């Protein structure tokens, strides 16, 4: 049974597409995000452990965000992104999602 679960996981994982996300933070995001940061990071850790999140973070200037995700389609990722506390509280103010083909 465990072998089947592992096989199923990798089958579903390989069927998922990769997406890149580019977005923008609100003004003074470093300060405004503080009350929500712990909840946000806990959620990201769960997404990372589930192999949905590959990487996510701000650019050095802290005006933009960049992420790579695994999802079945754009709508699934859009829903997932908008469930984040940073989106709900206006820390992230816009984003674009692009299907991505990992060359190597």
Describe each PLM feature range.
Residues 16-104:
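Conserved, structured core segments of small domains
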Residues 2-15:
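Short, Lys/Arg-enriched N-terminal segments with co-localized hydrophobic residues
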């Amino acid at each position: 049974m465990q072998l089947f679960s592992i096989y199923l996981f990798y089958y579903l994982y390989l069927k998922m597409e990769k997406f890149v996300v580019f977005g923008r933070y609100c003004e003074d995001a470093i300060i405004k995000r503080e009350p929500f940061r712990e909840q946000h990071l806990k959620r990201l850790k769960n997404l990372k452990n589930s192999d949905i999140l590959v990487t996510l973070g701000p650019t050095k200037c802290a005006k933009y965000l960049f992420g790579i995700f695994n999802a079945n389609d754009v709508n699934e990722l859009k829903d997932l992104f908008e469930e984040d506390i940073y989106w709900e509280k206006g820390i992230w103010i816009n984003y674009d999602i692009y299907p991505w083909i990992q060359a190597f």
